């Protein structure tokens, strides 16, 4: 399944560079390991999407249920770079 997430410019750049390998988000969708995430860069200055996108695959989902500082109703998605087409 594919999901779309709006990413602020700074977070988008960290995801694109590989420095950010997780996403904390509300548990309001049916996320599953193996699902694809399409991050769409959002500019607060322009108040619109920039047109830049980045794809990742969910490798693991942590739902702490209020433990370890994670608020109830939130999850952490571990992200992997999506392999390029034709490459293994």
Predicted regions and their residues:
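Catalytic phosphate/metal-binding cores of nucleic-acid and nucleotide-processing enzymes, i.e., regions
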Residues: 1-88
């Amino acid at each position: 399944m594919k999901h779309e997430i709006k990413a602020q410019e700074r977070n988008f750049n960290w995801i694109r560079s590989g420095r950010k390998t997780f996403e904390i988000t509300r548990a309001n969708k049916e996320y599953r390991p193996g699902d694809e995430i399409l991050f769409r860069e959002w500019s607060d200055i322009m108040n619109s999407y920039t047109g830049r996108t980045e794809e990742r695959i969910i490798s693991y989902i942590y739902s702490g249920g209020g433990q370890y500082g994670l608020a109830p109703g939130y999850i952490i998605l571990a992200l992997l770079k999506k392999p390029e087409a034709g490459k293994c």
